[in-house]
Regions:
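N-terminal redox-cofactor-binding region of secreted/periplasmic oxidoreductases
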Residues: 1-402
Length: 402
């Protein structure tokens, strides 16, 4: 079993140390450990949380937010355009990373966005390759006739994977409001997308979820990749291990700086593990650059301010962070409405009944977020859209030539 005690890895030598047991870290660990001749260690700051109903049961989504057992709960600096508020930025903490706490929506970007990466000078980063490997990760479970009769859900099997580790399905419990929302969007002029996983999401559509319909539990990177390979003797996972620094050998005339060890905090003590081949940093958007900077890799001006010796001058570390914004608009239904919503779960008696139904493979606990519409601002406010485009084009034109 790869989840080990700290004494089993401290001061030991391993071939690969992977920092972070989220999605990228666990996928890398499982792929590397396919070679039985190498040893792989994953250091994860959070806990394993395997079998935890707050993660596994679909309608428990949101219960993990701000909870330090599951969520890093980062807070931004004060945001000028958000009335100087500090905004919560939830990131998964524990095996599976954010795939263990997100809203389990299976979603893919537009093909044009991926192809743009290749056009910027990254050969191979194109939609054709992205589609190939994203399908390889997925097993899409066909919906039942009952689901398709109730849901405005269509799909194209050519865009779906059939033998990957991540289980993908249509949530079993449906809401009449989802169907009405889709019909309303079409009536407003949006096209209904046959399958949003084909590279075109500009319209209105029903999403699939990372749920395993055999158990109606979440399919995270921990359950999809780690659990099926948990018996590999050359794969070890240490949870509760907060990495504080990557240690390097000095550069020589024959080679560049080489990572030789990783220092981490476990409990109240500091430990090291030695690395024979590579350190692979998969600690996420926030923690990865932080670990690099703590290791002396980054902008000298930033490092010197906090007393960190510069190992490698790499000014891009920790810069150019961007994130999309989430805002909510809430509408109350007429008290006499027959539409069923998640508000019913606020009633302890109903919640207890739903829990019992879930144990029998029935009921609202098998719900998910499914209705989506993507459309340009020009569809609803062409005047404001034109103003924004003109402003952005002017800003681009004002930039000095490179």
């Amino acid at each position: 079993m790869p989840i080990v005690k700290v004494a089993e890895v401290a001061r030991k030598n391993v071939d690969y140390v992977i920092i972070g047991g989220g999605t990228s870290g666990l996928v890398a660990a499982v792929r590397l450990s396919e070679d039985p001749s190498v040893t792989v260690l994953v250091l994860e700051a959070g806990q394993d949380n395997l079998g935890d109903p707050k993660i596994d049961v679909p309608l428990q989504l949101g219960h993990t937010f701000r909870n330090p057992q599951y969520d890093w709960a980062f807070m931004t600096t004060k945001q000028k355009n958000a009335n100087d508020r500090e905004i919560l930025w939830s990131r998964g903490k524990g095996l599976g990373g954010s795939s263990a706490i997100n809203f389990y929506v299976w979603i893919k970007p537009p093909a044009a966005d991926i192809d743009a990466l290749e056009k910027l000078g990254n050969p191979g980063w194109n939609w054709a390759n992205y589609e190939k490997y994203s399908k390889k990760a997925e097993t899409f479970h066909l919906p039942t006739t009952e689901q398709t009769d109730l849901y405005p859900h269509t799909f194209d099997l050519k865009a779906r994977g059939t033998s990957g580790p991540v289980q993908v399905a249509i949530p079993a419990h449906v809401h009449t409001l989802d169907k009405l929302f889709q019909e309303t969007m079409v009536n407003k002029g949006l096209k209904a997308i046959n399958d949003p996983y084909s590279g075109d999401i500009n319209g209105t559509w029903i999403a699939s979820s990372t749920l395993d319909p055999r158990t109606w539990t979440r399919s995270s990177s921990a359950t999809a990749y780690l659990v099926p390979n948990i018996s590999r003797s050359n794969l070890k996972v240490l949870t509760g291990a907060l990495v504080s620094r990557i240690i390097f050998d000095p550069a020589t005339a024959d080679r560049e700086r080489t990572a030789t060890a990783v220092k981490f905090i476990h409990g109240d003590a500091i430990y090291e593990v030695n690395v024979d081949k590579e350190v692979i940093l998969c600690a996420g958007t926030i923690n990865s650059p932080q670990i690099l900077e703590l290791s002396g890799i980054g902008q000298p001006e930033v490092l010197s301010r906090v007393g960190i010796d510069v190992e490698i001058d790499l000014p891009g570390v920790g810069e150019n962070l961007q994130e999309h914004v989430s805002t909510s608009t809430i509408y109350e239904l007429d008290p006499g409405s027959s539409h069923e919503t998640w508000d019913l779960m606020r009633d302890p008696e109903y919640a207890a009944e739903a829990k019992a139904l879930y144990a029998a493979g029935k009921g609202m606990q098998r719900s998910g977020l499914t209705s989506f519409s993507y459309f340009p601002l020009s569809l609803v406010n062409p005047e404001e859209s034109r103003v924004l485009i003109d402003r952005l084009e002017a800003e681009v034109d004002a930039q000095p030539s490179q």
